[in-house]
């Protein structure tokens, strides 16, 4: 019995740490975009469909906004699966547009880091935020709402 309780706590803590790690990485990238200049116009033609049809300025602001907003949702564990899925789409577009042709090596701007981010985001998509989250609290407050199982 004690082992099961400790396992639940460990799982909650590890998912919390994972959420904080991903939030930091994506928020930092969002801040770089916030403080930098839009370079998406230079690579717009490399974006996959349908993102290549969207103007570079809009893509820039959507990417920046996603990298600034979704990390906060991850930290608090609110709409975690949706946030992780959205960030997975974002990093997949980045992988396809920037990193895919550069090989695996991080030093060559390769796809190693995007791959790590996708794998860790998949954990949150499949497992959710864990016990130490507002998603879990919301499910406890509203146990009869069947749609909350997707949180």
UniProtKB/Swiss-Prot annotation:
Annotated transmembrane regions: 8-28, 60-80, 82-102, 113-133
A GO cellular-component term linked to this record: plasma membrane
Compartments where found: Cell membrane
Superkingdom of this protein's organism: Bacteria
Entry membrane topology: Multi-pass membrane protein
Keyword Transmembrane helix: yes
Annotated Pfam families: DoxX
Keywords attached to this entry: Cell membrane, Membrane, Transmembrane, Transmembrane helix
Assigned protein family: Belongs to the DoxX family.
PANTHER family associated with the record: DOXX FAMILY PROTEIN, OXIDOREDUCTASE CATD-RELATED
Name by which UniProt lists this protein: Uncharacterized protein HI_1602
Originating organism: Haemophilus influenzae (strain ATCC 51907 / DSM 11121 / KW20 / Rd)
Lineage summary: Bacteria, Pseudomonadati, Pseudomonadota, Gammaproteobacteria, Pasteurellales
């Amino acid at each position: 019995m004690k082992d099961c309780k400790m396992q639940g706590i460990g799982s909650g803590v590890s998912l919390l740490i994972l959420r904080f790690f991903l939030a930091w990485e994506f928020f930092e990238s969002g801040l770089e975009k916030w403080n930098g200049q839009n370079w998406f116009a230079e690579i717009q033609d490399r974006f996959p469909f349908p993102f290549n049809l969207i103007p570079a300025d809009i893509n820039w602001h959507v990417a920046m906004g996603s990298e600034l907003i979704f990390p906060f949702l991850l930290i608090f564990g609110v709409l975690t699966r949706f946030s992780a899925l959205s960030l997975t789409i974002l990093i997949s577009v980045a992988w396809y547009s920037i990193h895919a042709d550069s090989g695996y090596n991080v030093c060559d701007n390769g796809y190693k880091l995007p791959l790590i981010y996708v794998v860790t985001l998949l954990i949150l998509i499949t497992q959710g935020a864990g016990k130490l989250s507002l998603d879990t609290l919301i499910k406890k407050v509203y146990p009869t709402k069947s749609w909350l199982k997707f949180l």
